[in-house]
From Swiss-Prot:
The gene is rpsH. Belongs to the universal ribosomal protein uS8 family. One of the primary rRNA binding proteins, it binds directly to 16S rRNA central domain where it helps coordinate assembly of the platform of the 30S subunit. This is Small ribosomal subunit protein uS8. Part of the 30S ribosomal subunit. Contacts proteins S5 and S12. One of its GO terms (molecular function) is rRNA binding. It comes from Azorhizobium caulinodans (strain ATCC 43989 / DSM 5975 / JCM 20966 / LMG 6465 / NBRC 14845 / NCIMB 13405 / ORS 571).
Length: 132
């Protein structure tokens, strides 16, 4: 099966699994997805993920979702830059999510990072998604 928007697919899998109160969900692996999952793990939105190699160059990530008092830690996760409409932001124009309580995940020349890291490194890029 061909996936046209791998980041949108990852976000949808996480959102659907948390709505159903699943402990884990799986997704096909890629370097961009791994970078995005690293940011979500470092910011405390997921417990972590494990990589399974199926051979033939195919990998799969099993994502361990995080809950607090029975409620998902991720209240809202939305895709910003889509295949049909890319959204880029300079350092001065980086979005603030929920007045600083959430994060925007960016793909920059220095790698995938949260908005506050991009401000610290004075770099802009493509706004992949917002998490609150």
């Amino acid at each position: 099966m061909s996936i046209n928007d791998p980041i949108g697919d990852l976000i949808t899998r996480i959102r659907n699994a948390q709505m159903r109160r699943k402990d884990k969900t799986s997704t096909p692996g890629s370097r961009l997805r791994a970078s995005l999952l690293d940011v979500l793990r470092d910011e405390g939105y997921i417990r972590g993920y494990t990589t399974t190699d199926h051979g033939n160059g195919r990998t799969e990530f099993e994502i361990e979702l995080k809950y607090f008092d029975g409620q998902p830690v991720i209240r809202e996760i939305t895709r910003v830059s889509k295949p049909g409409r890319r959204v880029y932001a300079s350092v001065k124009a980086l979005p603030r999510v929920a007045n600083g309580l959430g994060i925007a995940v960016l793909s920059t020349p220095q790698g995938v990072m949260a908005d506050h890291d991009a401000r610290d490194k004075n770099v802009g890029g493509e706004v992949l998604c917002t998490v609150f």
